[in-house]
Amino acid sequence: MPTKPHINLITSGHVDAGKSTLVGRILYDTGAIRDEELRKLKEIATELKKETFEFAFVMDRVKEERERGLTIDIMHRPFETQKWFFTLIDAPGHRDFVKNMITGASQADASIFVISAKPGEGIQEQTKEHAWLLKVLGINQLLVVLNKMDAANYDQKRFDEVKAEATKLLQGIGYKVAEILFIPVSAYLGENIAKKSDKMPWYN
């Protein structure tokens, strides 16, 4: 039986765009995390008054990361689909830990580039820096995830607006945007992660 092709995937993007939550949700929805593990993480998140962080805590395992609600170091976690075997590399978005992001990106074949679609967020400082770093490090395969669509009421206009901003940014750096897929999601609520969301019928 032939082995599945393997890809190292790093999450990238601004701090608080929802990268760790997205990784946790992908792992849960693909069966790489059991319900029992998620239940325990939810209890920890509640104790720390971080009620929506259970998916992020799948990868954010260090006490300081959980207390501060942000990723500090890189973390690896495997998962597989019917056709592919992946190693997800969760990387920090905060500017103080950009060296750790570079370490993770140097191990990656492609990136899930996460941008918040929440009104008032969108393209931010580390969004730009991470995009530039990925290009410099030779990562030309991007999947752009526009997260927090629930905070934008799943509005197509908001998706198109942030997509246009991201397109301008990535083209300016030298990416072939025609080859990049843009996906609207709500990582925390699991919309458009493992299956198509009925909240965004406008997206094909």
Describe each PLM feature range:
Residues H6, W84-T87, A91-F97, S106-A131, ...:
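Conserved Switch II/interswitch segment of TRAFAC-class P-loop GTPases
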Residues L22-I26, E37-K40, N100, E129-L133, ...:
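Alpha-helical scaffold elements adjacent to nucleotide-binding pockets in ATP/GTP-utilizing enzyme cores
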Residues A152-N204:
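Canonical P-loop GTPase G-domain recognition
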